[in-house]
Amino acid sequence: MNESQKAAIHSEGPTLLIAGPGTGKTYTIIQRVLYLIREKRVKPEEIMLVTYTQKASKELTTRLTDVLSKAGIEVNLHEMYIGTFHHICRKILKEFQEYTHLPKNYLAVDQFEQQYLVYEHLSEFAAIPDFRRVIQDSYLKQGELIRISPWRQCQTICRYVNGLSEELLLPEEMRRTCGNQLGGRIEVLARMMMKYTRLEEERHFIDFSRLQKETYALLSSYPEILDQLQKRIRYIMIDEYQDTNFIQEQLIRLLGGCSQQIFVVGDDDQSIYRFRGASIGNILGFSKTYQTCHTFKLDTNYRSHPGIVRFCMDWMRGLKSWRGADGRMFRYVKGDIHAASEETGTPVLRITGKDLSECHARIAAFIEGLKERGQITDYNQVAVLCSSVKSNASRALQLQLRRKGIASYAPRAGWFFKRQEVEWLIGTLLLLFPSFSDSMENRDDMQETRGILDIYFECMGVARMMLAKPRHRALKNWLDRTRSVISYEKKLPASFLHLVYQMLSFAPFSDILDSAVRGESNAARNLSAITRLIARFGFFLPENHGHGEETIADVQLFFSRYLRLWFENGVNEYEDEERYAPSGSVSFLNIHQAKGLEYPVVIVPSLDERARWDAESDLISQVVEKVSGRKPAEPPKEMKNFDLWRKYYTAFSRAETLLVLASSQKKGDTSEAFQWIMPALPAYNAKEADYHHLTCRPVGRNVFKPRFAFTSQIALYEECPMKYLWHRVYRFAGTQGSHAMYGELVHETIEDIHRAVLRGEADRVMPSVIYGWMMANYISLSDKENSWLPEAKLKQAFSEIRGYVDFRKGNWDDALAAECPLELVKDDYILNGTIDLLSGNGDQVQVIDFKTGKKPPMDSLLMEKYRSQLEVYAYLVETKLGRSVERLVLYFTSDAEDPCVVFPMSKERVEKRMEEFDETARRILARDFARRCEMKKNELPTACRFCDFRKYCGR
């Protein structure tokens, strides 16, 4: 630990830590948490730790739990606010749900789904007066009229809506104060925001921007809630502060309160997410916002060769001035960054060629030479960082490497629809529905997306060749038979997703699944992605036919709209966060994708990139200034240059041992930004290039501690290891039915009752109020799941809920906690569980779990499973809460006469159960998935009856 790290760790009050690449910022963050807990006696749940990505959150959680465990400190991670801003906002909104305007069962949507919602209603947006002043449908390029697809227009709408929301601008205020300014565009933008908000609320959707906006509204509107959180959260730490936006800064200021124990870590030189709304002003202006701020700089690089460190410093210093006309600096002055290593040589090289083809051939020869000389032992020690891995140049380089026998790993290169297994599956589905595929050329919507018809026809052609092989005759027979049934009955014989799982039971798809059982399979990952897409499609059907009851028209909509737009949006393949650089392959990454990673050898070939004006960011900045008076943190005319310099600084600083800049010598193939630095670098094949003695470390893997819960993981594995493999590891979508929705409805309404009681509002627990809670839950569940329950089932649900209230007879005094989450850090995993109800008096408590199914016999395997679940909960309660568990209770809502099954607490059984839990967790971590649920006396096990892979297993 160096002196700068020590000073930062012990700092009090607002603190800014400038931490460049490889300077040990994660280590510093973890050591600060350890210091606060061990030396300052701060409780873990009094610390908020915010990360920029989920991957960073997993890494911090794993390293933090290891450090705390070694120090003998137990942490309940559920109580600690650790994760991304979106995760923490969800946690706050869930805790104070009744104070928000959100439905309980809102559907969190991603970027594609948000954009799809807008696409469904694009005509309504286009009807806004002067809409085309903001959203163009075409532009002129060298005298040619270029059409902008409707999908790209929706992308722009979403960017404006998200960006303005994250600037905390209210559309009503925008219209009232500045509507006619900027040529009336502020009025158009305000109407777009209002239209989008209405659509989102009608569908019970919530996107990432709204999560933050709702959290801000909650904290601003309820001082008592803000006060409660400020007292609970004593220390706030934010990683990657240069990537935060305005609303995130405001959330931190609210939660920080008067104590201002806010510790931020970042590097302004790596601020590369302006297009996502990141504000460099947050980190540049931190010391002005918090005038008692302490500023520290980490100046020792533990990652890179000294020559690479010097090159990166020269890059940032050698560019145009970072100082504005008024003398303001738009970059922190870093001073010299020192490398911890004392290696010699010339680690920064250039590769050029008379054209791209020659340049690519030399890059391939260079990589091959590194391997032959033993400087690298695996091709995964090399990464190629591009402005876009989907560019023609990037794909050409991948093909050049392939000719040399060098594999590439490029999950974001846009190859998804070219993968053989994807072509087989989509092609077979298209052949199954000739009512669409025979006429798709004549559909207007299919003309919107360039290349989609070619993709569909190619998929069908590849599928036909596959089906013609004798080995695949069973699939061909199934296809012919099912297609005839659909044609004759004019409806699907099963849900769309069920049909896919029937297909997967036949070769060649079953061969892919067999391979996935033996080891990691990217082909199985791609098939899984399609099942998840189909499952999510059900949330967007225009009519609610009931879960799994799609019509032929719905399937046509899937192909003509949902899958088409998925293609146009750009589909990424699976990325393993732990094995981020698969053995045997050179990694191809976008520069933004590479942020936070490091590679022994980095090659940067996209030196033709020029600084580009970002029209959307510019308009958002103008609107913010007009409406709120807040000026941009940087000169608008310089933003595009600053962004380009920071982007390539981020790329260059990923390198540990060797950094290579590559470019064609053709005019225009090296932009002005790089022309000054390329001649100063030695060519890779020049005599002065002294790098052959440099050897590279092996690329490791990230190891994240997984979370294991009894019901969703351990019990599922014990029921059938292979089912665990498909649904938990490969994430194939499940075909859940209305029975799951019924259980959710009863559970959520009982939770509403418990929450009211715990708030001291037991007097509200009366039939009319309970019915209102139940119907509110039902409406939001129905909208979310695109399903419904018959009237008789709703009456039954209300009867069971009332039965529980009657059973209580108004006695709620023993209720201690509802939906109580607990976690325990083990050596190799994190054990977690959520207890429906914890009740009792004094130190003696009972653990209660609610079941909506039929009560099984006492000697059945299912009852034993239920008891095991309670024993795991008992272990968590006694270990984490220090409370003695007296009884374990199952409450069956369907049994009005005798709903409770009570088990005595047995420490011997709990210890045995936890030994079994550990053993099951060990098997999961060892990827022992080859076993199926056992058949007994030719009787189909219960686990198989509703299993999506039943036919694959031949059962």
Predicted regions span which residues?
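C-terminal accessory regions
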Residues: 583, 627-682, 923-945
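Conserved helicase NTPase motor core
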Residues: 1-18, 48-49, 56-57, 81, ...
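Helicase P-loop NTPase motor core
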Residues: 17, 26, 44, 292-293, ...
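Accessory C-terminal helicase-associated subdomains
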Residues: 183-189, 195, 205, 375, ...
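Conserved RecA-like helicase ATPase core segment
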Residues: 34-38, 246-352, 624
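Conserved helicase core region in the C-terminal RecA-like lobe
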Residues: 81-91, 237-240, 265, 565-616, ...
